[in-house]
Amino acid sequence: MRISAFFLALLAFAAQPAAAASSPNLLSLEQQLNTMVAGKSADVGIAALDLNSGETVSIKGNTPFPMASTVKVAVAALYLAQVDNGRRSLDDTIDGQSARSLMRRMLVHSDNHATDILLADLGGPRAVHDWLQANGIKGLRVDRNISDLLRSKRDLWDHRDSSTPVAMVDLLKRLYKAELIKPESRNFLLDLMAQCQTGRNRMKALLPGVPIEHKTGTLDGLADDVGFITMPDGHRVAVAIFTRGGTDRPRTIAETTRVIYDGFKAIFTWPFGAPALQK
């Protein structure tokens, strides 16, 4: 049976991820971001969410991008959730090291071996994936440990171990609001992300002095950065920026972060300061 070219095109269009809608107040910021990324050689996915107002902006927000080491946020989240429910402790010894030390190595220094030790103790990638799905985090999948990921042939459009920008920001939001982990664990996570030693030419590059808690991801042809930017009044914006291909990935992340910061600052900075973080 012959299928018309029009019908095939219609099917292809329907298979594309739906565009993530930006909030009306942020359409001007969305236009700025679109103009900026149009001049870049990299393919760029962006999502940003004001954690007070709930307003969002995104570019390719529902398109999957490889997470690289940004997946370590999800690994940390599951471990901390199990600390909170009494199954584990940060003082547990795993492979001769404390979980606390492994978490620090994973998040501050992006240590791949420490990540795989924690991941194996949790039950492997599937355990993290299933926990995310059970908690309603859609659009983020965990398929391999870091060793397997590094051994695999590079494919910038591989959907394994990928996240949409919107899904990553949803995870960040729910961690920040202590919906998936308790406030004490959330604060521990933020403290480690604030000490991140990698990717200083990304989110932090054009925002000197601005508090940023983040986690980078890097593979051949990929550069990512996800985390929280603190606005002048003290409230935070959750941000995920994924880039693949091209030659200007770190600079693109730095410039994108600056545009996001300026855009949210102009609209959502609270005149009397943000509400205090729940202890």
Name each region found by the language model:
Residues S4-A15:
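Bacterial N-terminal signal peptides
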Residues G54, P64-I94, M106, V239:
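Active-site SXXK
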Residues G45-D50, S58, A74, L107, ...:
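Soluble periplasmic/extracytoplasmic beta-strand elements of cell-envelope proteins
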Residues N25-G61, I229-T230:
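A short, well-structured edge-of-sheet supersecondary motif
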Residues L119-K177:
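Mid-domain, small-residue-enriched loop/turn segments at the edges of structured enzyme/sensor domains
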Residues R88-V128, L156, D161:
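Conserved catalytic neighborhood of penicillin-recognizing serine enzymes
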Residues A14-S22:
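Boundary at the C-terminal end of the N-terminal hydrophobic targeting segment
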Residues A21-N34, P64, D121, D170-G199, ...:
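Structured C-terminal helix/loop/strand segments within mature extracytoplasmic catalytic/sensor domains
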